[in-house]
Amino acid sequence: MTLQKKIIELLGVKPLIIPKKEIENRIQILKRYLIENTHLKTLIVGISGGQDSTLTGKLCQLSIQELRKEKKEKSYQFIALRLPYGVQIDEKDCRDAINFINPDQIFTINIKNAVLNSERSLKKQGIQISDYIKGNEKARERMKVQYSFAAITNGLVVGTGNAAENVTGFFTKYGDNGTDVNLISKLNKRQGKFLLKELNCPKHLYLKKPTADLEDEKPQKEDEVALGIKYNIIDDYLEGKKVNSLNKQIIERLYLTTEHKRKIINLG
């Protein structure tokens, strides 16, 4: 078995999807999980205004709406968290995403002071972190806030990572991958767009250039620039299509060198 086939099998990406069916399957799976775990009453998602959190948020809201109607229980709630670092550059996109999702509850927690306080504490001990490391601190701080909300609302933190990010390790270890469940991990970037289109999402939210936007010195740095490869090529690879040898090497090198992010290595 080639490494490409092994990766596709491990990540569970399908070569072809029917968007409507994929949406319904995810809603039913999430509802069933909440029904089986009776202590869980809320779903928590951090909304950035990007494609992945918009899709995840909408799937969560639809799941909760159906569950409330079926169970006649108002305690089921979807909570959308806005977690900017200072002033968000793409503020309008985030507002548009929130309007599209129409969450039951919305909270805005600015993480800037928490991140800066952590940076200052390290500096007092003679430790100077780089802008890149600070970016990862932002991702972890956002997850801390989400888990605080989950703890006080009997909630489940829902991740927003997709298969294209997973294969390349393009996420913060114990940051945006540190979630309870993930609804879109078996979808590549292209397939996520298909689902949002099916859900009548505003086009600009899934046609915009993806960015993690974690670095102060490189605001709105595009994912594809950071990765050194286009998402459509990664998507082709994950769908089992042939990509040229150079791009294949880039993807597989990223996969192998970020394996530690995807699983804990137990040495004893």
Swiss-Prot record:
It catalyses: deamido-NAD(+) + NH4(+) + ATP = AMP + diphosphate + NAD(+) + H(+). GO terms for molecular function: ATP binding; glutaminase activity; metal ion binding; NAD+ synthase (glutamine-hydrolyzing) activity; NAD+ synthase activity. Pfam families: NAD_synthase. SUPFAM superfamilies: Adenine nucleotide alpha hydrolases-like. One of its GO terms (cellular component) is cytoplasm. Homodimer. This is NH(3)-dependent NAD(+) synthetase. It comes from Buchnera aphidicola subsp. Schizaphis graminum (strain Sg). The lineage of its organism: Bacteria, Pseudomonadati, Pseudomonadota, Gammaproteobacteria, Enterobacterales.
